[in-house]
Amino acid sequence: HRLFQQLLKQAVEEASFCMMVQNASALLARTGLLFHRQVADYAYDENWKRMFTVGIDYIDGEKWISDGKYYSCSTTVAAMDMTFALISDNLDVSVAEKIAEEIGYSWDSSF
């Protein structure tokens, strides 16, 4: 477990951004990188969250949220919207809208 956590932490530290879908934030939480960060809440064992994710601000009711380079979403369905938001943030909203249109996805860029 420790080797995986070390490799994950190093990869995320070196990355320009980090996307977490549903309970993937639980994996990253163990590295300490999410301490004092906001993360979209997800359905998971509440006891486990209390034990291993102290110091992480889980935001209830949000489909997705970004905090710095960290993007998290509460469901797999919300991952598409989060992805287009990341494209918009890092490239341009027009690029995200064009890609969404090309694949036939109805993305609301106002979020």
Predicted features by range, described:
Residues 1-111:
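Active-site-adjacent pocket-lining segments in enzyme domains
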